[in-house]
């Protein structure tokens, strides 16, 4: 079986995206005998849904996990819920903006992840990786991707979720203002531990085709 990881390309003022670097580092690795496949998403509203839907349909992964950067956050933050809402003061990489439209006109207003994020936060902290639970993935592309990931994972009775990470230290050092960061190695270790924990503790009633 497969674990599917999604990261994002650089966007806005951020010329490097740690989610891309994390996914590229873990692509092709093995987690508890499951092969990790990494896919980098464009930061474009009009493109990500088809790409996510297609990859999940093709691979039917046991776990689909999105990774995104949240500049300003100091810890790894597993997300609890995605909302059916698009709002962006800044455009995406194609200049597209939204002002309150739904991601899925027929979908639920919010979708909870089926990953045990509360326990995951405890695990990361116990392993020396700063983490805290997040109850908001925002309203930009990360929330958009998370909503689609969870919706599609449910169709295959599999696991789906999203984790935000800080900026990586080497990039934050080049930004001319104070901003929280974390080493890339620590974040890679955190995402690897997260996948191991999720797969080890997957719900017994889930079946996979």
Swiss-Prot record:
Keywords: Cytoplasm, Hydrolase, Protease, Thiol protease
GO molecular function, one term: pyroglutamyl-peptidase activity
GO biological process, one term: proteolysis
Cysteine pairs bridged by disulfides in the record: none
Alphabetized CDD domains for the sequence: Peptidase_C15
PANTHER family documented for this protein: PROTEASE FAMILY C15 PYROGLUTAMYL-PEPTIDASE I-RELATED (PTHR23402), PYROGLUTAMYL-PEPTIDASE I (PTHR23402:SF1)
Protein name as annotated: Pyrrolidone-carboxylate peptidase 2
